[in-house]
Structures are given as structure tokens and as C-alpha cells.
């Protein structure tokens, strides 16, 4: 709705981080071509899509690439969290939004309990987004009361990923972070029943 208004006012429009039209609505290309002065894309394959459609485009890279750096080694992170670096570590990344956490945390807890039954000595390391409150994490106590070894690190996702052997993560930015750390992952996503 805003694009036509800005275009009519002759205001140049630079669009940073392309809509995922390659996965959803390819028809949006016509709208973007009509109104956008330049697309700044973060994935290399997007550049060709826009160029082929005649949309001015520049590949600028993904903002996480330079940021995905752990501040501690696996051993340092495990020791700081009270875990044994010589035992398997599964990272749990439940997401950063309260609603996402409410929908996914029960599934992550159930998954962790299943993994623990199959993998002797496994430990769980949870990356917690700093803005999330304690009440939302209360269900994680189930893991500790079930005798599982678990620790939570606030705002240290890259350290958690560096320490992990495998990751169970919410779909989204964390999947890109996990890939940048070259960790195998299981991606979870749950939609509302209305969807």
C-alpha cells in the first residue's frame, strides 16, 4: 500500500531484504518492478531472480555472516554452563518471540526427553533470547526434574551453537545461524490451529 504512494511522490524506494517471493508469490515481481528503485538482496540466488525480471538489484550479503562468531570454545561454554564437554550436547533454540516459545517449547521438551532415552549421557543447552521472561521457560524445569542434564544461556546463541553436536531449532533466523556454525539441525515449526 505504501509503495504506490511513495512512487507517486517520486521518492526513490530501496528495498532491503527481499520478500521470499521465490518461495511464495512470484506475482509480486511485477509490483516490485513497477515501484522499487533498487532491491538489496541477502542471498546470491535472489540477484538472478530480480535481474531476470528487470528489477534493479544488488547482492549485499547476509547480515548474520559477520556476526555469527562464538566468543567461547565448546569446552569453555560447556564448563561455564556446568556441562561436560566430553559428552554429547544437543542445543535447543526455541525462538525469540513469546508466542513462538509458547507453541514450540512443549515440543522441544518432548523431543529432548525422547533423545535422552536414546542417547546415553546426552546434555541439553538452551539458547534463550534475552527479552523472554522466566515464566515462559518454566516448562524446561520438566527436563531437570526428569533427571536430564540441562543448562540455559541468555543471549549467547553463537556460543551455544559452537558447543553443540546437533541442534533442534525453531524455524527462522536461528536456522541461518546454525548453518553458519556448520551444525546439523532439526527444524521445528508449529502453526496456530486457525492457520
State the predicted function of each range.
Residues 84-91, 122-123:
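Charged active-site motifs of nucleotide-sugar-dependent glycosyltransferases
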Residues 37, 88, 165:
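Conserved acidic residues
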Residues 97-127:
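Conserved catalytic-core segment of nucleotide-activated headgroup transferases in glycan assembly
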Residues 14, 40, 58, 125, ...:
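Hydrophobic/aromatic beta-strand patches that form the interior of the parallel beta-sheet core
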Residues 1-78, 93-101, 121, 129-131, ...:
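Active-site and donor-binding regions of nucleotide-sugar-utilizing enzymes
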Residues 154-195:
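A donor-sugar binding/catalytic signature common to diverse glycosyltransferases
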Residues 137-155:
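Nucleotide-activated donor-binding/catalytic signature segment of Leloir-type glycosyltransferases, i.e.
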Amino acid at each position: 500500500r505504501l509503495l504506490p504512494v511513495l512512487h507517486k511522490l517520486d521518492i526513490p524506494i530501496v528495498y532491503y531484504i527481499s520478500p521470499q517471493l521465490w518461495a511464495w508469490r512470484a506475482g509480486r515481481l511485477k509490483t516490485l518492478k513497477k515501484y522499487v528503485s533498487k532491491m538489496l538482496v541477502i542471498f546470491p540466488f535472489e540477484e538472478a531472480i530480480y535481474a531476470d525480471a528487470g528489477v534493479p538489484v544488488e547482492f549485499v550479503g547476509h547480515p548474520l555472516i559477520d556476526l555469527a562468531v562464538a566468543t567461547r570454545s565448546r569446552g569453555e561454554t560447556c564448563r561455564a554452563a556446568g556441562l561436560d564437554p566430553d559428552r554429547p550436547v544437543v542445543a535447543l533454540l526455541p525462538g525469540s518471540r513469546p508466542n513462538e516459545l509458547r507453541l514450540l517449547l512443549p515440543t522441544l521438551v518432548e523431543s529432548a526427553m525422547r533423545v535422552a532415552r536414546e542417547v546415553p549421557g546426552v546434555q541439553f543447552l538452551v539458547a534463550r533470547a534475552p527479552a523472554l521472561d522466566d515464566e515462559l521457560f518454566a516448562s524446561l524445569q520438566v527436563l531437570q526434574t526428569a533427571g536430564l542434564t540441562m543448562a540455559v544461556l541468555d543471549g549467547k546463541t553463537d556460543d551455544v551453537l559452537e558447543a553443540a553436536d546437533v541442534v533442534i531449532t525453531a524455524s527462522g533466523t536461528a536456522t541461518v545461524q546454525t548453518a553458519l556454525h556448520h551444525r546439523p539441525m532439526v527444524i521445528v515449526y508449529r502453526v496456530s490451529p486457525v492457520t
